[in-house]
């Protein structure tokens, strides 16, 4: 491991990596406005991550929100810097894996090349742990939403705790099975699936979260309209090729986010049945901030 790290350091100090990276970036200067907008639009997805938001909802005290926010932001910055470093250096250190399908294994390939099996296994376990942490959080959020909000909230309001638990377990099984089937598609990549899911989360939930936090005029009907409109736009935009029109090359999260936001606002303004209890709760939280 030390020999690999030493060799890696020598190549970095010699300027080899810098020259190689410069050559790769200069060879890809044909980026237009569409790829740039699409890259920036990825940030919209953070507003609609239910498995992250639920952590803040379950916080012990509202006094800890500010600290938690800072910790989360710092951690994301550190993680993304590490990701960029590994990906950038991997394109030079491991040029043989630059095919679109193999490029997703750059982290594991770099570890296998630089560290012995024992240490490499520990690092690879960290990747698996991160994936499992995200997966189980999303499964729990999805199953609880279906069992509590849909089954008990709409289908059977007098459902017992045992019935809700059974529905929750069934939902976990079905969602996991669907995810497994999607993973069997040999023509799809991890990045492609994550990108699609990221757009779905961000465009359907993101605008609603922002409206719920900053606008007391938002209503349930507006939220439902925005949710449906954003979701349909994501699916439709994703399946329309850019050859139809250049604008369809824009990452689907951006148009879907706008559609969801506009529909939620318009329908809420048209909805005369405002919930006085929700407005009072909004005002109470606003006074707490002041």
Model segments located where?
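Membrane-embedded helix-loop-helix hairpins and adjacent transmembrane boundary segments
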Residues: 1-290
């Amino acid at each position: 491991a030390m020999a690999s790290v030493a060799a890696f350091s020598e190549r970095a100090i010699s300027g080899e990596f810098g020259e190689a990276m410069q050559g790769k970036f200069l060879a890809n200067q044909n980026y237009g406005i569409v790829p740039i907008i699409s890259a920036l639009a990825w940030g919209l997805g953070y507003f609609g991550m239910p498995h992250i938001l639920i952590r803040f909802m379950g916080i012990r005290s509202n006094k800890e929100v500010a600290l938690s926010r800072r910790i989360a932001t710092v951690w994301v910055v550190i993680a993304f810097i590490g990701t960029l470093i590994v990906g950038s250096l991997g394109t030079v250190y491991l040029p043989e894996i630059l095919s679109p399908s193999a490029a997703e294994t750059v982290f594991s390939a770099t570890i296998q090349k630089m560290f012995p099996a024992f240490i490499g296994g520990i690092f690879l376990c960290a990747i698996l742990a991160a994936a499992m942490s995200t997966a189980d959080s999303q499964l729990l959020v999805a199953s609880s939403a279906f069992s509590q909000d849909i089954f008990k909230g709409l289908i059977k309001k007098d459902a017992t705790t045992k019935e809700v638990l059974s529905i929750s377990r069934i939902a976990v099984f079905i969602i996991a099975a669907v995810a497994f089937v999607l993973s069997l598609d040999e023509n799809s990549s991890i990045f492609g699936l994550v990108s699609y899911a990221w757009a779905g989360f961000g465009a359907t939930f993101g605008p609603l979260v922002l409206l719920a936090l900053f606008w007391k005029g938002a209503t349930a009907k507006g939220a439902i309209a925005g949710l449906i409109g954003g979701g349909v736009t994501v699916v439709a935009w994703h399946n329309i090729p850019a050859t139809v029109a250049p604008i369809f090359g824009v990452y689907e999260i951006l148009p879907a986010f706008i559609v969801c936001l506009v529909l939620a606002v318009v329908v809420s303004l048209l909805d005369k049945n405002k919930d006085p209890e929700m407005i009072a709760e909004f005002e109470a939280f606003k006074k707490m901030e002041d």
